[in-house]
Amino acid sequence: MGLEKSFLLFSLLVLVLGWVQPSLGVESRETQTQKFQRQHMDEEGHFPSSPTYCNQMMKSRGMTSGSCKPMNTFVHEPLETVQAICSQGQVTCKNGKRNCHKSSSTLRITDCRLKGSSKYPKCDYTTTDSQKHIIIACDVVHLDATV
């Protein structure tokens, strides 16, 4: 009888962890690169965007969980195009660091800005499409191994 009770408790624990663990959020398990892609890349996105694009994307990409992110930019270009910016013109970042690079050409982007009257949990954004240069921070090259 004790073994059956232990098995039942273990099964319940596994079931509860299965429900709780996903609610911890993808943000806690993602790398910086994955976070950048989630928050800023939308290669497949329609350009120009619909007026509700930002409301939909900000929510689906987890940027309205717990609070409304005030602003965000989505880039509608292949990831390889954005990664290649790291070999283009170096500029000083807003924080004073020198690991930022400016795109040599304009890219298709959508800016999302929280409307002034909007309050969590009903995050409401304005959607503005444009073609602009972007500046991204690139990590220092890391030598992982020699073989």
Swiss-Prot record:
Residues reported to bind substrate: 35, 38, 69-73, 94, 113
Annotated compartments: Secreted
Keyword Cytoplasm attached: no
Write down the chemical reaction(s) this protein catalyses: an [RNA] containing cytidine + H2O = an [RNA]-3'-cytidine-3'-phosphate + a 5'-hydroxy-ribonucleotide-3'-[RNA]; an [RNA] containing uridine + H2O = an [RNA]-3'-uridine-3'-phosphate + a 5'-hydroxy-ribonucleotide-3'-[RNA]
Keywords assigned: Disulfide bond, Endonuclease, Hydrolase, Lyase, Nuclease, Secreted, Signal
Q: Which residues form the active site?
A: 40 (proton acceptor), 142 (proton donor)
| E.C. designation(s) | 4.6.1.18
- Superkingdom of the organism of origin: Eukaryota
Q: Which SUPFAM superfamilies match?
A: RNase A-like (SSF54076)
What's its top-level EC category?
Answer: lyase
What protein is this chain from?
Ribonuclease pancreatic gamma-type
